[in-house]
């Protein structure tokens, strides 16, 4: 049964990856689904999440979870990836289209995705159309979603199930980490530079030729001061801001910066609450309340006795 479960989980991951590769091609290769192929751990000891190696621009991300939950309880982890809906990004082929968003959620040990039969009707609607995948077998409490259309989803809701009560259950506060990205990255997970970049000159010299390539990009030929020629390969969809005969310096931009997206990460805490502690607290509070009531009644009785004695 366990082998069968793993087989279908791996099959689901393969089908989803194949779908993304076919329909999003290189434009999607900086999302968590691809980062997991190159990074065994989603988060370094320093706190840096793997997605930040591909998305070089920093953008905000918001995470909302309950302060505390009971064991074996389903709750929502809501991730907001805000961005300007009017902007368009450059695809791997150079065309312009709307931004996609994706997220990675790193939960404390023991927390996992809630099964479908535990979801409320409201939660089913919020998660409709979203496919959640585990990062890998060594990180069973880390899950990913995306890329999905940012126009369709203004937030990403993860249905989370807290660990069941047991002898080894730790009723403590634990950290929850999240990473969220919008748009394409500047570096592919394999280290290659994407066309969603500002391209700059690698040396001093004069732009001697600018020519188009078959894939929609450009080749900028720079004649250096010592007479050699350097060819700068510019990705498709770039806007050239230099012209032939222009003097350029090393690190001088040759194109505009097309990137409109970015990556952000955040963290918060969630506590696993012991029901027995809560029951004990309620009983203690009830005892204090009753004690206060009896003290007030006793005081009233004492005042009546004093008043009666004064009348005699």
UniProtKB/Swiss-Prot annotation:
Report any one BP term from Gene Ontology. photosynthesis
Membrane topology type: Single-pass membrane protein
Superkingdom per UniProt: Eukaryota
Q: What is its main location?
A: plastid
**Where in the cell?**
Plastid, Chloroplast thylakoid membrane
User: What family does the database annotate?
Assistant: Belongs to the cytochrome f family.
The protein's name in its UniProt record: Cytochrome f
Q: What gene is behind this protein?
A: petA
